[in-house]
Amino acid sequence: MFSKATLFFTAAVVIVAAGATPTTSQCNTGPVQCCDHTQQASGPTTLTGIGEVDLGDTSTLIAYGNCSPVLPVLGGPKCQGQTVCCDNTEFEGLVNVGCTNVAV
């Protein structure tokens, strides 16, 4: 009887933990992205490996480099860069503009 109760409790904990897995629903404009680089921008900005990008007079967080969607896979690869949610992608997909940091 004791082993059945332990098994039931363990299964319940696993089910609750699986339901608590972070999701990417924190971003209303698309998937949460994992990007190699982020930088606060204001006016013309020089980005490592890309060159100068004119963002006008906006003061915004930009993400650039290798950006890929963060997938909520239990035990999957972790983001080694910065997780961000961006309003749009500009400059032929090289730079994501209007980003905010996201805790995943």
Curated annotation (Swiss-Prot):
It comes from Pleurotus ostreatus (strain PC15). Keywords: Cell wall, Disulfide bond, Secreted, Signal. This is Class I hydrophobin 12. One of its GO terms (molecular function) is structural constituent of cell wall. Aerial growth, conidiation, and dispersal of filamentous fungi in the environment rely upon a capability of their secreting small amphipathic proteins called hydrophobins (HPBs) with low sequence identity. Class I can self-assemble into an outermost layer of rodlet bundles on aerial cell surfaces, conferring cellular hydrophobicity that supports fungal growth, development and dispersal; whereas Class II form highly ordered films at water-air interfaces through intermolecular interactions but contribute nothing to the rodlet structure. The keyword ATP-binding does not apply. InterPro entries: Hydrophobin. SMART domains: HYDRO (SM00075).
